Regions:
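Bacterial Sec-exported substrate-binding components of ABC uptake systems
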Residues: 2-3, 9-13, 18, 27-84, ...
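Short helix-initiation/N-cap motifs at beta->coil->alpha
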Residues: 61-63, 120-129, 246-253
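A short, structured surface patch at a secondary-structure boundary
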Residues: 82-130
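Alpha-helical, coiled-coil/dimerization segments enriched in small aliphatic residues
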Residues: 104, 221-249
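Proline-aspartate-enriched helix->loop->beta-strand connector
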Residues: 135-140, 157, 256, 260-264
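Extracytoplasmic substrate-binding proteins
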Residues: 151-216, 306, 310-327
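Structured C-terminal subdomain patch of bacterial secreted/periplasmic proteins
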Residues: 263-327
Length: 327
C-alpha cells in the first residue's frame, strides 16, 4: 500500500503491476512468517513435551527420595540462591515464592525478577502459613530445612538440596526438579567457555599474575572474599592472591595498605550499615597511597559478582571483560 501511494503519478499500468508485485511479495512473506511461527511453535511444544515426558520422576536428595508425577508449574524456594538458578536457565515463570527474596533485591542483576507481580516475598525464614497460602506444586529447600522437612512435605512434595559455595554444584540439581537439566548444563558450558576465553585475554594483556582483592566496606573496614566463590577470578582468570588470604575475612584500611594489591575491586555496601564510605576513603592518605588507587586500577563493582550465585558470577565475567577493554 505504501509503495502504491508513492507512485500515484505513474501510469495506471505501472501502478497495477506494482500492486500485483506487492501482493505476491506479501503472500510470500506471510507464508514464510506462518511457516516460521509454526516451526517455532513446534520447537517450543517439542521442548515442553520433552520435559513433560520425563515425568513422573523420582528425585534423590538429602532427605531421601521424592516422587514428582508431573512437571511442577508452581515452585516455592526456601533458599534464594536456588531461585537464582531457575532465573538463570529461563524458568522464572515457575517461581511462585521465595524465602529471602529481599536479598536478591539488593543486586541489580535480579531487578527484572524481583519487581511487583513476580514471585512472592516469603520473608527471611520459611513460614508454614505463608507457604500453605501459595499452594505450591513443589518446595525446593536447603540443608537448614531438614528440621522442618516433615512439615514442608505436608504442604507439597519437598526436595532438599544442600547448599554450596559453588553454584555449579547445585544448578543441575535444581533444574532436575523441573526436568530441565539440559538448560543447566548449557548455562554452565556457556559460563565456562566465556571464562576460558577471557582468561586468554588476561594472559595476553599481562594482567595474569597481578595481585587483586575483592572486598566490600564493612563496619570501619572491609570484608574480603577469597574462597571457592572467587576461584573463577583467581584460578580461572589468573589474578594472584595476597599472602595469607583466607576464604573470607575482615581487613582494615591499614591491612589493605600492607598487602597493597595491584587491583582493588570494591563492592557497593548494599547493607547501608558500613561506617567506612568511598567519600571518606577518598580523603584518606593511606587510601590514596595504594598502588591500585594511584594507577587507576580501583574498580567499584556491584556486590553480586563476588557472591556464589549463577547470574551474579556470569555478570562478573561481563564486568571483567568490560574492565579489560579499558586497560
Amino acid at each position: 500500500v505504501f509503495a502504491a501511494s508513492t507512485t500515484k503519478e505513474r501510469s495506471f499500468l505501472v501502478t497495477v503491476m506494482i500492486l500485483l508485485l506487492l501482493l505476491l511479495t506479501a503472500c510470500g512473506n506471510a507464508e514464510k512468517k506462518n511457516g516460521a511461527d509454526v516451526q517455532n511453535a513446534g520447537v517450543n511444544e517439542a521442548a515442553n513435551a520433552s520435559a513433560g515426558a520425563s515425568f513422573p520422576r523420582t528425585i534423590k536428595h538429602a532427605k531421601g527420595e521424592t516422587l514428582l508425577q508431573t512437571k511442577p508449574q508452581k515452585i516455592v524456594v526456601t533458599y534464594f540462591p536456588y531461585a537464582d538458578h531457575l532465573y538463570a536457565i529461563g524458568e522464572e515463570s515457575v517461581v511462585s515464592g521465595v524465602v529471602g527474596l529481599q536479598s536478591l533485591r539488593n543486586f541489580p542483576v535480579y531487578d527484572a525478577y524481583t519487581k511487583e507481580g513476580g514471585a512472592k516475598d516469603l520473608g527471611s525464614e520459611a513460614n508454614i502459613e505463608k507457604l500453605l497460602d501459595l499452594k505450591p506444586d513443589v518446595i525446593i529447600g536447603w540443608g537448614e530445612d531438614a528440621k522442618i522437612y516433615d512439615e514442608l512435605s505436608k504442604i507439597a512434595p519437598t526436595v532438599l538440596i544442600p547448599e554450596s559455595e559453588n553454584w555449579q554444584d547445585t544448578i543441575g540439581k535444581v533444574a532436575e526438579v523441573i526436568g530441565e537439566e539440559d538448560k543447566a548444563q548449557q548455562y554452565v558450558k556457556d559460563y565456562n567457555d566465556k571464562l576460558l576465553k577471557l582468561a586468554g585475554k588476561f594472559e595476553q594483556t599481562g594482567v595474569k599474575g597481578k595481585t587483586a582483592i575483592f572486598m566490600m566496606t564493612w563496619g570501619k573496614g572491609f570484608n574480603y572474599y577469597g574462597g571457592v566463590r572467587m576461584e573463577p577470578y583467581y584460578k580461572g582468570l589468573g589474578f594472584a592472591k595476597f599472602d595469607g588470604m583466607k576464604d573470607w575475612g575482615e581487613i582494615s584500611l591499614e591491612g589493605v595498605g600492607a598487602v597493597d594489591p595491584d587491583y582493588i575491586f570494591l563492592g557497593k555496601d548494599f547493607t547501608g550499615k558500613a561506617e567506612m564510605t568511598l567519600k571518606e576513603l577518598e580523603k584518606s592518605a593511606v587510601w590514596n597511597s595504594l598502588t591500585a588507587v594511584k594507577t587507576g586500577k580501583l574498580f567499584i563493582i556491584d556486590t553480586e559478582i563476588v557472591g556464589p550465585l549463577a547470574m551474579g558470577q556470569m555478570k562478573g565475567l561481563e564486568v571483567m571483560e568490560s574492565i579489560m577493554q579499558k586497560l
